[in-house]
Amino acid sequence: MKWTFILAVAAGGSLGSVARYLVGIGFGRLLGPKFPWGTLFINITGSLLIGLFAGLFAIRWNLPQAVRIFLIVGICGGYTTFSTFSLDSFYLIERGEVAAAGAYMIASVVLSVGALIAGIQIVRVL
């Protein structure tokens, strides 16, 4: 484990998190709180961004690993972890593991929402 990688994640994560917060606030003010438009926008644009980075790293950009970590794990991860979920799903599909990709996508959504509900219920009981 290199400290430069940890610092790259921390720096990128802080920028991505601030961007997520500002976008969420902006959409909330613009469209109101009835539907999570900001979150939807963040998840879609974060997935697009990580796809662009992954594609550029694979075919065009020869950047140091710390810069790649800063952009993908840091900025994209801070902006939305949904982008990482999307990239992992794509990699499974690209490797021909379509059933595993489907199971991963369904399990991720269902189990994550289930875990959230469980967490809320635990707090309510306490």
Curated annotation (Swiss-Prot):
Membrane-spanning residues: 5-25, 39-59, 69-89, 100-120
This protein's UniProt keywords: Cell inner membrane, Cell membrane, Ion channel, Ion transport, Membrane, Metal-binding, Sodium, Transmembrane, Transmembrane helix, Transport
Catalytic activity field: fluoride(in) = fluoride(out)
Paired cysteines (S-S): none
Regulation: Na(+) is not transported, but it plays an essential structural role and its presence is essential for fluoride channel function.
One function term, GO molecular function aspect: fluoride channel activity
Record family assignment: Belongs to the fluoride channel Fluc/FEX (TC 1.A.43) family.
PANTHER family xref list: FLUORIDE EXPORT PROTEIN 1-RELATED (PTHR28259:SF1)
GO cellular component terms listed in the entry, alphabetical order: plasma membrane
Organism superkingdom: Bacteria
Entry-linked Pfam families: CRCB
Function: Fluoride-specific ion channel. Important for reducing fluoride concentration in the cell, thus reducing its toxicity.
The organism of origin for this protein: Nitrobacter hamburgensis (strain DSM 10229 / NCIMB 13809 / X14)
Lineage: Bacteria, Pseudomonadati, Pseudomonadota, Alphaproteobacteria, Hyphomicrobiales
Protein name from the UniProt record: Fluoride-specific ion channel FluC 1
Positions contributing to Na(+) binding: 77, 80
Annotated localization: Cell inner membrane
Membrane disposition: Multi-pass membrane protein
Coiled coil (residue ranges): none
